[in-house]
């Protein structure tokens, strides 16, 4: 990755216009309501704990919604609660995207362990410039099964730490010295001319894009030692919003 540059990524520029927020419509428990009358904030987060999905939309149509719903059901089950049916969710999402339109958007669905759920649809702009990565030095447990859950502040704190250090994303390592993922992304790395991604068992969230590149692009699943990061030939950050963002450098 040497010499590939270190252009920063601005991320997804969510519309933060206050006048828009005051009249913003969201879904709360299947009903279209004003944001001020809902249980979520303007980014779709609710108080308490639960699971969530962040989904890319194109022309107001959510991408890979069924896959996201299956993951949400699985995540909720691991935490001991259930969520609304896919039929109910699809109907509510269609209504929301018809009212809060965006050529490209971010759909966030939050499912609380108390039975409440919410959805917001926000416009965003994707920045595909190559990202500079750093290795986060505080390891995570390799024993705990990752679940896409909130509060999400611990992951966002890692991302903010990376940005405050002059990087765009942080690589998380487990307590066995294995590479896991980015703070808010999965990793796709090229080593010895082969594309690989770390296994779920190493402490990796089961990303939708990660699953797709494994299924359709011949990507291998293999544990990666942190020392191997020095030998990476090429890399991408994977997420449902970024799709596949190229990496400019690692600890450069």
Label the predicted regions.
Residues 8-23:
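Short, Lys/Arg-enriched N-terminal segments with co-localized hydrophobic residues
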Residues 20-99, 112-251:
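Helix-start/capping segments and mature chain N-termini
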Residues 102-107, 160:
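Hydrophobic alpha-helical interaction segments
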């Amino acid at each position: 990755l040497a010499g590939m540059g270190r252009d920063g990524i601005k991320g997804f520029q969510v519309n933060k216009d206050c006048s828009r927020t005051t009249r913003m419509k969201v879904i709360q428990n299947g009903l279209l309501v004003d944001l001020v009358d809902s249980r979520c904030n303007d980014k779709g987060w609710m108080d308490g704990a639960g699971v969530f999905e962040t989904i890319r939309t194109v022309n107001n149509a959510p991408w890979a919604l069924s896959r996201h719903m299956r993951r949400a059901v699985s995540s909720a089950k691991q935490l001991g609660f259930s969520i609304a049916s896919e039929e109910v969710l699809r109907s509510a999402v269609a209504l929301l995207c018809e009212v809060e339109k965006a050529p490209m958007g971010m759909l966030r669905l939050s499912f609380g362990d108390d039975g409440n759920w919410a959805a917001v649809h926000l416009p965003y702009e994707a920045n595909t410039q190559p990202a500079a990565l750093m290795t986060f030095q505080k390891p995570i447990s390799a024993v705990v099964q990752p679940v896409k859950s909130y509060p999400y502040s611990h992951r966002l704190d890692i991302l903010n730490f990376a940005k405050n250090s002059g990087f765009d994303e942080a690589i998380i390592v487990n307590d066995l010295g294995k590479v896991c993922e980015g703070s808010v992304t999965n990793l796709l790395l090229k080593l010895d001319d082969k594309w690989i991604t770390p296994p779920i068992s190493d402490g990796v969230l089961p990303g939708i894009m990660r699953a797709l590149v494994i299924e359709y692009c011949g990507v291998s699943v293999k544990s990666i030692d942190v020392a191997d990061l020095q030998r990476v030939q090429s890399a991408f950050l994977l997420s449902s919003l970024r799709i596949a963002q190229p990496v400019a450098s690692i600890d450069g």
